[in-house]
C-alpha cells in the first residue's frame, strides 16, 4: 500500500551508498574483515540476521581483544577495549519481521577509535536459513579508508531487498533519535 512505499524510501535514504557484504552461514564459521582507517571518530555497523538462526558473533579488535556477542540475548552490551568503547544493541523480535538487527556502535575513549582490521567471526549453532547482511554507514559519514576487505558490489549500491520491506518505521525513528550523527541530521539545537 501507500505506507510501505514511503517506508522503502526511508530505508533507501538510510542505507543507500552504504558499504555492505552478505553471505550465507551454514556449517562452517565465517570470518569477515573490516578495515577501520586512522582518525575515525565513530562508526556504527549493522548486522542483519534471521531470528530463526542461532549463531555466536565474536568481534575481534585490531589489538586482538575478543568480544563475544550473544544476539539471542536481547538488549545491550557495553565493552571497553583498547581505545574504543563498543556498544552492542540487539533488536527485539517483531511480529512483522523475520529479521533481527544487531547494531554495533564504536566510540572513541580518547579522540579516535582503534584503527586497523576488526574481524567479525560468525560461528553457527542452529542455522535455519543462514543469510546475513553487514552494513557500514554512508560514505559521507566515514573516512575513505574504512571499508570491508571484500565488499559485496550489489550491497554497496542497494539496500537489502529483504530488509527494506520488513524493517519497522519505529526502529528507524528510534535510531534517528539515538544516533543523530548517523542519520545525517546533526544535533538538535
Model-derived regions: residue spans:
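Loop-rich non-cytosolic ectodomains and luminal regions
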Residues: 1-189
Amino acid at each position: 500500500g501507500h505506507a510501505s512505499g514511503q517506508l522503502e524510501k526511508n530505508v533507501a535514504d538510510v542505507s543507500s551508498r552504504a558499504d555492505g557484504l552478505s553471505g550465507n552461514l551454514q556449517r562452517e564459521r565465517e570470518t569477515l574483515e573490516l578495515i577501520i582507517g586512522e582518525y575515525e571518530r565513530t562508526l556504527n555497523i549493522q548486522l542483519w540476521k534471521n531470528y530463526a538462526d542461532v549463531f555466536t558473533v565474536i568481534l575481534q579488535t585490531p589489538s586482538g581483544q575478543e568480544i563475544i556477542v550473544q544476539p539471542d540475548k536481547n538488549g545491550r552490551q557495553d565493552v571497553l577495549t583498547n581505545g574504543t568503547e563498543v556498544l552492542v544493541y540487539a533488536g527485539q523480535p517483531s511480529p512483522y519481521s523475520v529479521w533481527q538487527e544487531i547494531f554495533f556502535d564504536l566510540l572513541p575513549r580518547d579522540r579516535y577509535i582503534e584503527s586497523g582490521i576488526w574481524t567479525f567471526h560468525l560461528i553457527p549453532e542452529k542455522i535455519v536459513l543462514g543469510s546475513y547482511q553487514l552494513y557500514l554507514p554512508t560514505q559521507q559519514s566515514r573516512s575513505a579508508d574504512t571499508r570491508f576487505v571484500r565488499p559485496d558490489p550489489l550491497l554497496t549500491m542497494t539496500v537489502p531487498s529483504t530488509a527494506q520491506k520488513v524493517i519497522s518505521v519505529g526502529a528507524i525513528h528510534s535510531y534517528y533519535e539515538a544516533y543523530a550523527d548517523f542519520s545525517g541530521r546533526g544535533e538538535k539545537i
